[in-house]
Amino acid sequence: MTIPNDIRITPELVAAHGLKPDEYQRILDLIGREPTFTELGIFSAMWNEHCSYKSSKRWLRTLPTSGPQVIQGPGENAGVVDIGDGQCVVFKMESHNHPSYIEPYQGAATGVGGILRDVFTMGARPIAAMNALRFGAPDHPKTQHLVAGVVAGIGGYGNSFGVPTVGGEVNFDPRYNGNCLVNAFAAGLARTDGIFYSKAEGVGLPVVYLGAKTGRDGVGGATMASAEFDETIEEKRPTVQVGDPFTEKCLLEACLELMATGAVIAIQDMGAAGLTCSAVEMGAKGDLGIELDLDKVPVREERMSAYEMMLSESQERMLMVLRPEKEPEAEEIFRKWGLDFAIVGRTTDDLRFRILHGGEEVANLPIKELGDEAPEYDRPWAEPKMPPALDAATVPAADVADSLLKLLGSPDLSSRRWVWEQYDTLIQGNSLQIPGGDAGVVRVEDHPTKALAFSSDVTPRYCEADSFEGGKQAVAECWRNLTATGADPLAVTDNLNFGNPERPEIMGQFVRAIKGIGEACRALSFPIVSGNVSLYNETLGQAIPPTPTIAGVGLIPDWSKMARIAFAGEGQAILLAGAPESWGTHLGQSAYLRDVHGRAEGAPPPVDLAHEKRVGDFVRGVIRSGTVTAAHDCSDGGLAVALAEMAMASGIGARIDAPVNSASAAFFGEDQGRYVLTAALAREDAQLATLIEDARKAGVSLIAIGVTGGRELKLGEARAISVEELKEAHEGWFPRFMQDGSLQ
Amino acid sequence: MKSAVIQLPGLNRDRDMIAALTKISGQAPVTVWQTETELPEVDLIVIPGGFSYGDYLRCGAIAARMPVMKAVAEKAAKGVLVIGVCNGFQILLEAGLLPGALMRNASLKFVCREVKLQVANANTAFTRAYAPGQIIRCPVAHHDGNFFAAPETLARIEGEGQVAFRYAEGTNPNGSINDIAGIVNGAGNVLGLMPHPENLVEAAHGGTDGRALFESVLGRAA
């Protein structure tokens, strides 16, 4: 059956396309007539939240996006940052939340595929991937199924494509029961003189379709992703695309080969809203019209209508404007890789977006206005309610050793080995640090010493309690994780996941998170160069906690001086940098309070950005000078968990002094801006005193708290725990849960 | 040492292999596209890992039927050394150049981790730089590495010393029968193995245990 183009446009049909009555009126005013059915589809594709950023644009503009290192900020397929020597890193993070909940394997797989395509569309070869995943409570009936499907989907696509997955996050929280989050990050390496953009240039040039054929999968996907879920969720399965990593790998090689010939004028991948979005983007950016003849589009199904072709989200497709004289050469490259190559249209000078199908003109719209005139909202927002600060006196003392073991074996802090062993972390032969440390590190091919560090961070429970501080904290933690390897943090990409923005309290979370993120990025000279907003993560009125994922990239000038989290040897002094005199104080919203005492209370730990920068700059300095032999930041679970992770990574134990004040606050407080460092010095060594004095002069507190050695971790007065016992607690939870749903 | 790396759509550890061969032999290998019907004069042919043709149908099945594989078989018959790693091993099996089969991992999941290998036969062209019985570190990364052979075939492989590498110290990651990680053909000039020695050949990889495999071949060729 073919869907005809002359279907009558009714208010119900308009609503089914996710367009509000006033938005439809805007369309009528813009084109001066009733749209055809295909045109209505095109408008719905361009004007949905996912593609138009209509609720978020106003606030995104307030974010810092520039810096001397930034070559390309937001607005292209991915951000581009200079790393010297004529090379640059190209990266972005994007959500595939809605499809992953409906069909976890394909939803996650195509999320990875989409982000990889964004990167290589710009002329970069992907060198690293990460994934930030949030699932519902472990005891929710869907959770195990979603974890298994999403992880297998990410691995299935990334492994076959051939990119190492070097980092990521996995969290569980009942608030994600109805909406899981899958945020996929990819980074690639390019020459600064070999970056490709989507802006078309030149009139009458061929518009070329490349890659896989167009099918009916994913029709309306972007519109689906711009609405909340309800009981009809199962009916939305056909809006999820199906991934083919093999074709994508071929597409990567063919595109890079083609780019090297100088044939490409402009290139845009077909992601959300497929052919529609990519063609409009190329034309509108270049102040050109585009005419497409759909009869020439390679299809894998018969009798597809113009409407379906324009809205299909079939994967592994590209649109390019090519130099006509290079056409035969280009076609030969694509044939070699077994990919479709078809001239499907041309650029024009009339600024119209014209679609021909079966000899008929099925759409004729003003191309600039399709993007530029999309509605933009200044949605009302309310200051979210914030919990009062925690009265630490109400937290009873718990056994430190038992608490540590409980935290290490908790759903959120247990080892993620079960997840990342399903990802190829080593392919390309450049992985220097794989998941399990502070950041993934990949060396820069063809350079003797340079490496890039990657980390993805956000603490949703902090954001829920105070989205401003939570937004700040996400940026600061990412910056800190990169710093802990010895990297210079360069820039970030953000993936802002929130509920329904039409609710003022959700919009309030969004606005305040953006303000916090902006403030932190400015203070840390850590600009945002790309990103994605995912709203309507809500089911039957229940929204996810605000989850602004921050993924950052750092540059390590010489990886032989890079730091790792593993203790490097026995008898080394352990130092705590950036901490208050009592080591730790802040238990509000801590993992300890939640997982040991069952209380989600208090304000999140505040981030003092000037302090953050001071401490981080000092730490980076002592890593690079070779003074420091291991480094790890303190985050979830505080100092105790950081020390345990350093011990487990090395097999070496440690003996830590007894804290002067409260042991629980010292060991489990989540005060920000702290690092655990080790130095190959005895505690009584004069050089250690000099180091501490140097730190003091730099305005950084540096406290000697213990010594590495043995096979046990002894925290103050608490009973010593063998490293083996720590590992058992840490490694056990995830495989048990995935094996039989065990929650213990 | 002159070497050739076979390239097929979907293979993705070709760049790793080219880098390793270049670093160890001091000479970049030539690359040969799947449609070639003749191979250059080389001492070693390598089929690297990946997902040729997406591993659709069956791992290595489509790749084994490409023109270049006929040329590889001809060279192998003449005694030229051939290594197939991971998907390359699967392709060699599908092409009939090695006995047995590789099934889905017993866990049914993709697995990427470091394992221990024992050099089960140090008298092959690919293992001579190792000590007999030596235990080495080596990463694996695969979904279908569960080696299986019918009893009589298995008896022959074991009896003739065709097992080159075994997973050691309880690190068998995939359920392979007899912990088999890599085998050679009867003539001893074709090696197939699931682990990735090319990903452990320099300090940046955190170890160099994979190097001796290539050095074994280099020793013979030099």
UniProtKB/Swiss-Prot annotation, chain A:
<dbReference type="InterPro" id="IPR016188">
    <property type="entry name" value="PurM-like_N"/>
</dbReference>
<feature type="binding site">
    <location>
        <begin position="313"/>
        <end position="315"/>
    </location>
    <ligand>
        <name>substrate</name>
    </ligand>
</feature>
<feature type="binding site">
    <location>
        <position position="532"/>
    </location>
    <ligand>
        <name>Mg(2+) 1</name>
    </ligand>
</feature>
<dbReference type="InterPro" id="IPR010074">
    <property type="entry name" value="PRibForGlyAmidine_synth_PurL"/>
</dbReference>
<keyword id="KW-0436">Ligase</keyword>
<feature type="binding site">
    <location>
        <position position="118"/>
    </location>
    <ligand>
        <name>Mg(2+) 2</name>
    </ligand>
</feature>
<comment type="subunit">
    <text>Monomer. Part of the FGAM synthase complex composed of 1 PurL, 1 PurQ and 2 PurS subunits.</text>
</comment>
<dbReference type="Pfam" id="PF00586">
    <property type="entry name" value="AIRS"/>
</dbReference>
<dbReference type="GO" id="GO:0006189">
    <property type="term" value="P:'de novo' IMP biosynthetic process"/>
</dbReference>
<feature type="binding site">
    <location>
        <position position="92"/>
    </location>
    <ligand>
        <name>ATP</name>
    </ligand>
</feature>
<keyword id="KW-0547">Nucleotide-binding</keyword>
<keyword id="KW-0067">ATP-binding</keyword>
<keyword id="KW-0460">Magnesium</keyword>
<feature type="binding site">
    <location>
        <position position="534"/>
    </location>
    <ligand>
        <name>substrate</name>
    </ligand>
</feature>
<dbReference type="Pfam" id="PF18072">
    <property type="entry name" value="FGAR-AT_linker"/>
</dbReference>
<feature type="binding site">
    <location>
        <position position="531"/>
    </location>
    <ligand>
        <name>ATP</name>
    </ligand>
</feature>
<dbReference type="InterPro" id="IPR041609">
    <property type="entry name" value="PurL_linker"/>
</dbReference>
<dbReference type="InterPro" id="IPR010918">
    <property type="entry name" value="PurM-like_C_dom"/>
</dbReference>
<feature type="binding site">
    <location>
        <position position="494"/>
    </location>
    <ligand>
        <name>ATP</name>
    </ligand>
</feature>
<protein>
    <recommendedName>
        <fullName>Phosphoribosylformylglycinamidine synthase subunit PurL</fullName>
        <ecNumber>6.3.5.3</ecNumber>
    </recommendedName>
</protein>
<keyword id="KW-0658">Purine biosynthesis</keyword>
<feature type="binding site">
    <location>
        <position position="269"/>
    </location>
    <ligand>
        <name>Mg(2+) 2</name>
    </ligand>
</feature>
Swiss-Prot record, chain B:
<dbReference type="GO" id="GO:0006189">
    <property type="term" value="P:'de novo' IMP biosynthetic process"/>
</dbReference>
<protein>
    <recommendedName>
        <fullName>Phosphoribosylformylglycinamidine synthase subunit PurQ</fullName>
        <ecNumber>6.3.5.3</ecNumber>
        <ecNumber>3.5.1.2</ecNumber>
    </recommendedName>
</protein>
<feature type="active site">
    <location>
        <position position="196"/>
    </location>
</feature>
<dbReference type="GO" id="GO:0005737">
    <property type="term" value="C:cytoplasm"/>
</dbReference>
<dbReference type="GO" id="GO:0005524">
    <property type="term" value="F:ATP binding"/>
</dbReference>
<keyword id="KW-0547">Nucleotide-binding</keyword>
<comment type="function">
    <text>Part of the phosphoribosylformylglycinamidine synthase complex involved in the purines biosynthetic pathway. Catalyzes the ATP-dependent conversion of formylglycinamide ribonucleotide (FGAR) and glutamine to yield formylglycinamidine ribonucleotide (FGAM) and glutamate. The FGAM synthase complex is composed of three subunits. PurQ produces an ammonia molecule by converting glutamine to glutamate. PurL transfers the ammonia molecule to FGAR to form FGAM in an ATP-dependent manner.</text>
</comment>
<feature type="active site">
    <location>
        <position position="198"/>
    </location>
</feature>
<keyword id="KW-0436">Ligase</keyword>
<keyword id="KW-0963">Cytoplasm</keyword>
<keyword id="KW-0378">Hydrolase</keyword>
<dbReference type="InterPro" id="IPR029062">
    <property type="entry name" value="Class_I_gatase-like"/>
</dbReference>
<keyword id="KW-0315">Glutamine amidotransferase</keyword>
<dbReference type="GO" id="GO:0004359">
    <property type="term" value="F:glutaminase activity"/>
</dbReference>
<comment type="pathway">
    <text>Purine metabolism; IMP biosynthesis via de novo pathway; 5-amino-1-(5-phospho-D-ribosyl)imidazole from N(2)-formyl-N(1)-(5-phospho-D-ribosyl)glycinamide: step 1/2.</text>
</comment>
<dbReference type="InterPro" id="IPR010075">
    <property type="entry name" value="PRibForGlyAmidine_synth_PurQ"/>
</dbReference>
<dbReference type="GO" id="GO:0004642">
    <property type="term" value="F:phosphoribosylformylglycinamidine synthase activity"/>
</dbReference>
<keyword id="KW-0067">ATP-binding</keyword>
<comment type="subunit">
    <text>Part of the FGAM synthase complex composed of 1 PurL, 1 PurQ and 2 PurS subunits.</text>
</comment>
<dbReference type="Pfam" id="PF13507">
    <property type="entry name" value="GATase_5"/>
</dbReference>
<feature type="active site" description="Nucleophile">
    <location>
        <position position="86"/>
    </location>
</feature>
<keyword id="KW-0658">Purine biosynthesis</keyword>
